[in-house]
């Protein structure tokens, strides 16, 4: 059956928590306040939907990579035998059911709040879009198999991560809220840069996979990652320049900006693990800064 730690590793619980929080970020940015009442209930259910969805996605990824991980990552819960494949598949299916069930319950609450439930349809569309991305990322027999197509696979993962913010905004009937859309773009770019660096970091274990780093080489992949970070910098400053956030509140994202710029040194020195870690820190600091900018 595996220990609790084994299941947390299989589900990549840390990433799931990030998705859970991302839904709340979308709601907070949209409301410019903390959600309460029915908005809080909807946001919590959607966050649970994202958590269970991401847990299923991550576990399915390991399930499908079972043979590869027996060689490259024999310490993982599935190839090591600590978690049985059949039990893992049951957990994957259960996670999908919980995700859909949470979405359904949130929809019931939303339906009671409005006379025009069509305004809540984007929430369902975003959930379905994430499902389509998952299926096309993993399946290379019938669908696109983006996982082994290099940059498109990185982009699919990054968009799916960014979508959780729009999911939170859509849950309270405002999927195209300018502040939420800004964070969606910024988060997608941050994640895309980090995904590329992680591919460079994993090149030794990715032999036989068609990742972007394996296609173009480590140096070009690092350069691409840095260029995307520079685009992220522009995306960070744009909503302040456009008045979406108060210009004076740019001080709140300063720690994220400085951390972002510090990544260049690690990329230049080919310190991929450090670069990946700093990008994640920069992204976290930026999210905190944008929340403060929205609440002030």
Where are these regions (language model features)?
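Intramembrane alpha-helical segments
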Residues: 2-9, 78-176
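Residues within membrane-spanning alpha-helices of integral membrane proteins
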Residues: 16, 47, 93-96, 124-127, ...
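Structural signal for membrane-spanning alpha-helices in multi-pass inner-membrane proteins
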Residues: 23-30, 99-107, 134-141, 164-172, ...
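Functional transmembrane core segments of multi-pass inner-membrane proteins
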Residues: 30-45, 155-203, 219-236
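Solvent-exposed interhelical
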Residues: 49-100, 188-236, 266
